[in-house]
C-alpha cells in the first residue's frame, strides 16, 4: 500500500507558480482527497467523497499512465505545435502542424472556451477543477523524478481548466469540422496570392485520413433483452473501434463517490467521466452513427467580387478573421504565420481542390451542429448516474448532448434499448428536395447557400436551435436483441425496421456492412445468449465475407488458368488451406484474400446476387465469375496479390500473427483481427510497415461483456492497446498480450472484488483545497 498525503513544499510552489496570467490559489480549510486503488493491469478504481476529489484522482491517475499523451494533445488543441515543432512537422494523425494550429485557433477561441465553461454545471466544474489539480500534482512529482523521454521539452506544462474545455471541443467536432482542418486552413479566394495554398501531398494525406474516419472510429454493439438472455436480465457487448494512439485513445477506470456514484468503463483523454461502461443496474455502449452532423452550403458568389456572396438577392461580404500562429524556424527563432479565414452566415469557407473549389462562381461554407453543443459533459454525467434504461433514455431526450454516436443499453430488469439520438442538423426530406444539390448524393449534404430558406429548421422542442428534437430521431426498445455496426438505424433488429427518416438521420434500403450481417446471422441462432456467445462474436475472428465468396473463388481456381497457372497456383493453394479466419494462426490465404477482395469490393457489378432491399441480410453475395469482365478483374486482382506477397517476402508458411503487430515503443506483439470491410467483427486497421509487416493503428479498443445477477453487474473485458502509452510502464503492452491470447479478465466492481484482486494496491493523495486554476486565454 502506498500513502501519499502531501507534496513537498517546493513541488507545490513549482506547481502553482507555474500558472500563467495571474492564476492563483487561495487556501481553504477543507482537503482535496482521493483514493486510487489499482487492480490487475493497473486499472485505477478512484474513490473520493466529492466531485473535486474524484476529479483530482482521475487527473492524477491519468497522468501516471499517459502524461506525455496528454501533454501532446494539450499542445495540439492550444494551437502551439508550430511554435515548438515547426510548421512542417506532423501530428499523430499525419496533419501538418500549421493546418492543425490554424484550425484550433479558429475552433478554440477565448470566447468559445469561456462560453462552454460557463455552460457547465457546478458539479462538472468541480470535477474538471479537480482533474486539473490531480494532473498537475503528478506532473510536478514527475518533473522532480524526471519526465519520460517522449516529453522532456519546454512544451510540457501544467493544465488549466481551459485545456480540458479545448480537448472536449476537439472531440465534439470529430464527426464534422475536425475532418476539414486543411480545407478550412487552406481556403483562399481565387486569384489571391497573399496566402499560399497547401502542398499537394498534404491534401492527399487529408483525403486518406477523411476516408479512414469511419474505419478508425467504428464499433460493434449487441444488447440482449430478457427474452433472449440466459438469465432473463440484460446482456451487453461493447466493442468500440477507435485509434490506438493519440487523442481518441480510451482509458479504463472505475469512479466512485459513496452513496452518489459507482460507475466503471472507459473514457477519452481529458474527460473526467465514463463514456462507455456500466454501473450497478445499467450497462451501455456507443457506436459511431451514420447520421450527418454537418452540412455544406454552396454559396453563389457576387460576380464582381469572389469575397462577397448572394443571399436572397443581396450581396454580403464574407467575414474575415485573421489568425496568427508562431512557427519555429530552422534557426530556432519564432516567426509569425498569418492566414485570413473567411466565413458566411452559415460557417467558415472550406476549400478542397477538385472537390470543393472556390472559384469566381461558387464557394462552400461548413456548418457543424456540434459547435453549439455545450451539453456533452452533462450528458455523460447523467448517463453515468442512470439506474435503468428508462432513466438513461430520459436523460438523452432532455439533454441531447451525444455528439456523433448511437447508444445501446441494457439494464438488470432485462430491458434493451437502441437510440440514434445524437446532434443532427434539422434538414427534413422536404428541405433536401428543395435545397440540396442532387449531384452530391447523400454522403455529404450540400445545401443551397443563396437562400435563407435553406437554413436548418428550428424546432422549439430541440435542445438547441437547428437540430432535430429527440422525438424525431430513431430509437427502439426490445426484449429480444438489438445490434449495430455503423450502418444506419434501419436494421438494428430486422423484426422492427426503423424507416421513414430524413437521409440526414438514417437511410433505408441500402446494403448493410458485412459486420452487421455477421452479427445478425449469429444472433438469429442464439436462443438463450450466454456471455461466451457474445465473446465469441469477437474472438472467433471469423471473416464473414469468406463465406459469401469462397466457393466461387475456389471454383475459379479449378478452371484452366492458362498461362497464369504457375503464378496463381500458390495463391489458390493458400486460399484452399486457409481457415477463413483473421486469427493469429491464419495462413497466407488470408493475406491473399485481402489482396484479392478489397479491390473487387469497389465494383458492385462483381456480385453474383445483387443487393436486394427486401433481403438485406443475405445480399449481395457470390462472385459472378461467369461474366467475362468479372473473371478478368478477379484474375488481375489475384495476380496483383501474388506480386505483392512476393515483394513483401512472405513465405508459404507465414501466419497472420507474424505480420500484423503493434511494435511502436516496445517489442512487437501480434494482434488478431482484420479489415471490417471483409466482415471481420474484430475489426483491426493496420498499415504497411517494414519487412512485410503491418502496424496496427486502430480497431478494437475497450472491450467488454456485461451481464447482471441478483448482486449486480458481472463484467469481463480488456483494453486491447493497454492502459499506458508510456513504454517504460508495466502496463504498456500487458493487456495487448492478453488480447492476443483472447484472454478476457473479470472487471472487479464491488469492494470485495477490488480488494481480493491479486495486484491490489492503494494510493491516497491529499492536499489542502485550493481555489480555481484560472483558464488560460
UniProtKB/Swiss-Prot annotation:
Its chief place of residence is: periplasm
Give a Gene Ontology cellular component term annotated to this protein: periplasmic space
Give the top-rank taxon of the lineage listed in the UniProt record for this protein.
Answer: Bacteria
- Secretion signal span: 1-25
Output the Gene3D superfamilies linked to this UniProt entry: 1.10.1400.10, 2.30.120.10, Glutamine Phosphoribosylpyrophosphate, subunit 1, domain 1, Penicillin Amidohydrolase, domain 1
Propeptide found at: 196-218
Active-site residues from the entry: 219 (nucleophile)
- Which keywords has UniProt assigned to this entry? Hydrolase, Periplasm, Quorum sensing, Signal, Zymogen
Briefly state the protein's biological role: Catalyzes the deacylation of acyl-homoserine lactone (AHL or acyl-HSL), releasing homoserine lactone (HSL) and the corresponding fatty acid. Possesses a specificity for the degradation of long-chain acyl-HSLs (side chains of 11 to 14 carbons in length).
Q: What family classification does the UniProt entry report for this protein?
A: Belongs to the peptidase S45 family.
Oligomeric state and interaction partners are given as: Heterodimer of an alpha subunit and a beta subunit processed from the same precursor.
Other facts? AHL-mediated signaling mediates quorum sensing in many species of Proteobacteria, regulating hundreds of genes, including many that code for extracellular virulence factors.
Q: What's the protein here called?
A: Acyl-homoserine lactone acylase PvdQ
Organism of origin: Pseudomonas fluorescens (strain ATCC BAA-477 / NRRL B-23932 / Pf-5)
Amino acid at each position: 500500500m502506498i500513502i501519499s498525503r502531501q507534496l513537498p513544499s517546493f513541488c507545490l510552489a513549482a506547481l502553482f507558480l507555474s500558472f500563467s496570467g495571474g492564476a492563483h490559489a487561495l487556501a481553504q480549510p477543507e482537503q482535496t482527497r482521493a483514493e486510487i486503488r489499482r487492480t490487475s493491469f493497473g486499472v485505477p478504481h478512484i474513490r473520493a467523497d466529492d466531485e473535486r476529489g474524484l476529479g483530482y484522482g482521475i487527473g492524477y491517475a491519468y497522468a501516471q499512465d499517459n502524461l506525455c499523451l496528454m501533454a501532446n494533445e494539450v499542445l495540439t488543441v492550444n494551437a502551439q505545435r508550430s511554435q515548438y515543432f515547426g510548421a512542417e512537422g506532423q501530428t499523430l494523425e499525419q496533419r501538418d502542424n500549421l493546418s492543425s494550429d490554424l484550425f484550433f485557433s479558429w475552433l478554440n477561441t477565448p470566447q468559445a472556451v469561456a462560453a462552454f465553461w460557463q455552460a457547465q454545471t457546478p458539479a462538472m466544474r468541480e470535477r474538471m477543477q479537480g482533474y486539473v489539480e490531480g494532473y498537475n500534482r503528478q506532473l510536478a512529482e514527475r518533473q522532480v523524478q524526471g519526465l519520460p523521454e517522449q516529453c522532456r521539452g519546454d512544451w510540457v506544462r501544467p493544465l488549466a481548466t481551459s485545456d480540458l474545455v479545448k480537448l472536449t471541443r476537439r472531440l465534439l467536432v470529430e464527426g464534422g469540422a475536425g475532418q476539414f482542418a486543411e480545407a478550412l486552413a487552406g481556403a483562399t479566394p481565387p486569384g489571391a496570392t497573399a496566402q499560399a495554398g497547401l502542398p499537394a501531398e498534404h491534401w492527399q494525406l487529408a483525403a486518406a485520413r477523411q476516408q479512414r474516419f469511419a474505419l478508425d472510429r467504428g464499433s460493434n454493439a449487441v444488447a440482449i433483452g430478457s427474452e433472449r438472455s440466459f438469465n432473463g436480465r440484460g446482456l451487453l457487448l461493447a466493442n468500440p473501434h477507435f485509434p490506438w494512439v493519440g487523442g481518441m485513445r480510451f482509458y479504463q477506470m472505475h469512479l466512485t463517490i459513496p452513496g452518489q456514484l459507482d460507475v466503471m468503463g472507459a473514457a477519452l483523454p481529458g474527460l473526467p467521466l465514463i463514456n462507455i461502461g456500466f454501473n450497478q443496474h445499467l450497462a451501455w455502449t456507443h457506436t459511431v452513427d451514420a447520421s450527418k452532423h454537418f452540412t455544406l452550403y454552396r454559396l453563389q458568389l457576387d460576380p464582381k467580387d469572389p469575397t462577397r456572396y448572394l443571399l436572397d438577392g443581396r450581396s454580403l461580404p464574407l467575414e474575415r478573421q485573421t489568425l496568427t500562429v508562431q512557427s519555429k524556424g530552422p534557426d530556432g527563432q519564432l516567426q509569425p504565420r498569418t492566414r485570413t479565414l473567411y466565413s458566411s452566415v452559415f460557417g467558415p469557407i472550406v476549400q478542397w481542390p477538385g472537390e470543393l473549389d472556390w472559384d469566381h462562381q461558387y464557394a462552400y461554407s461548413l456548418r457543424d451542429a456540434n459547435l453549439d453543443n455545450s451539453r456533452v459533459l452533462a450528458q455523460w454525467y447523467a448517463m453515468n448516474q442512470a439506474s435503468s434504461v428508462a432513466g438513461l433514455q430520459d436523460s438523452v431526450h432532455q439533454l441531447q448532448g451525444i455528439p456523433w454516436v448511437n447508444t445501446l443499453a441494457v439494464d438488470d430488469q432485462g430491458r434493451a434499448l437502441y437510440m440514434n439520438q445524437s446532434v443532427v442538423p434539422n434538414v427534413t426530406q422536404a428541405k433536401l428536395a428543395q435545397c440540396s444539390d442532387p449531384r452530391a448524393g447523400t454522403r455529404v449534404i450540400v445545401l443551397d447557400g443563396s437562400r435563407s430558406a435553406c437554413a436548418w429548421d428550428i424546432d422549439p422542442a430541440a435542445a438547441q436551435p437547428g437540430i432535430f428534437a429527440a422525438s424525431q430521431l430513431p430509437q427502439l426498445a426490445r426484449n429480444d436483441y438489438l445490434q449495430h455496426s455503423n450502418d444506419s438505424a434501419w436494421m438494428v433488429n430486422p423484426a422492427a425496421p426503423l424507416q421513414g427518416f430524413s437521409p440526414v438521420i438514417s437511410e433505408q434500403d441500402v446494403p448493410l456492412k458485412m459486420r452487421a450481417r455477421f452479427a445478425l446471422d449469429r444472433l438469429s441462432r442464439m436462443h438463450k445468449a450466454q456471455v461466451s456467445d457474445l465473446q465469441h462474436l469477437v474472438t472467433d475472428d471469423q471473416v464473414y465475407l469468406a463465406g459469401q465468396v469462397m466457393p466461387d473463388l475456389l471454383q475459379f481456381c479449378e478452371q484452366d488458368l492458362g498461362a497464369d497457372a504457375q503464378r496463381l497456383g500458390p495463391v489458390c493453394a493458400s486460399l484452399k488451406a486457409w481457415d477463413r479466419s483473421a486469427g493469429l494462426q491464419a495462413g497466407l490465404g488470408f493475406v491473399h484474400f485481402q489482396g484479392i477482395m478489397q479491390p473487387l469490393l469497389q465494383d458492385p457489378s462483381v456480385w453474383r446476387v445483387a443487393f436486394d432491399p427486401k433481403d438485406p441480410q443475405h445480399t449481395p453475395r457470390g462472385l459472378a465469375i461467369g461474366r467475362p469482365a468479372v473473371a478478368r478483374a478477379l484474375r488481375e486482382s489475384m495476380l496483383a496479390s501474388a506480386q505483392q506477397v512476393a515483394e513483401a517476402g512472405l513465405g508459404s508458411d507465414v501466419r497472420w500473427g507474424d505480420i500484423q503487430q503493434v511494435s511502436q515503443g516496445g517489442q512487437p506483439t501480434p494482434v488478431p483481427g482484420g479489415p471490417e470491410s471483409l466482415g471481420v467483427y474484430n475489426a483491426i486497421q493496420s498499415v504497411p510497415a517494414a519487412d512485410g509487416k503491418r502496424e496496427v493503428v486502430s480497431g478494437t479498443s475497450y472491450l467488454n461483456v456485461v451481464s447482471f445477477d441478483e448482486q449486480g453487474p458481472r463484467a469481463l473485458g480488456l483494453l486491447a492497446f493497454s492502459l499506458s502509452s508510456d513504454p517504460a510502464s508495466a502496463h504498456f503492452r500487458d493487456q495487448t498480450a492478453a488480447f492476443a491470447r483472447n484472454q478476457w479478465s473479470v472487471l472487479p466492481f464491488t469492494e470485495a472484488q477490488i480488494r481480493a484482486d491479486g495486484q491490489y494496491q492503494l494510493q491516497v493523495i491529499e492536499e489542502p483545497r485550493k481555489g480555481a486554476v484560472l483558464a488560460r486565454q
